[in-house]
Amino acid sequence: MKIINLTKGTTVYTSNVYLVTGTWNAIKDQNTLIDVGRDPTVFDKINNASTGVGKHKVDQVIITHNHYDHASLLPRIREAYQPKVFASSQYLKNVDTVVRDGDLLRVGDETAEIIHTPGHSSDSICIYCRESCTLFSGDTPLVIRSDDGTYESDFVRALENICKKDVSVIYPGHGDPLHHNCKELLQTSLRNVQSAMQKHA
């Protein structure tokens, strides 16, 4: 799997936009955009990316949640590349398939699991790629350093589910990827959330 952050270094307020392709650009690999953001320079970067001879530049789009900084360019992306569009929100226009917790998709050359993570928004999802132990987290709060917050039980269950995965790298909706001690970070966050739940019980 190859991952390119198409909005790295941008001056536009936008989410990260990840172009995920297969390592060898095989025909069966699914060239995938995770979020589309709102920076129009992504079009040139997509067009210049190595996505495989005779293949679509973008086979599919997965939207992590329906906020403008993550989904604004979706109509233009759809017009330019005619991808299939997956999202958890049934209210987002231009969606082909509404995904549910536990659904499996092919992303690049890997199998990816959809994890529903309500909290930041009711339609938030993470995307977990099993073979490379990679988690695309959108805006799901995964770095929780204290037990001062309040959390919905559905989010706690989602975080417990994520903590059961073998996660070695996290690609967030904003900022740089996390490559070190991801499992320990997630376990610490879960302990803080569980402590917060007990405090507010």
Give the location of each predicted region:
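Short, compositionally biased "basic patch" segments
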Residues: M1-D29
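Core dinuclear metal-dependent hydrolase active-site scaffold
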Residues: K2-L6, L19-V20, G102-C129
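Hydrophobic/aromatic beta-strand patches that form the interior of the parallel beta-sheet core
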Residues: I4, I62, F86, T97-V99, ...
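Short, charged, surface-exposed secondary-structure boundary motifs
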Residues: T14, K93-V99, R145-G149
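Short acidic, glycine-rich loop/turn motifs
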Residues: G22-N25, S89, C129
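Metallo-beta-lactamase
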Residues: K28-L33, R38-P40, T111-H116, S122-H200
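Active-site HxH/HxHxD metal-binding segment of metal-dependent hydrolases
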Residues: Q30-N31, G37-G108
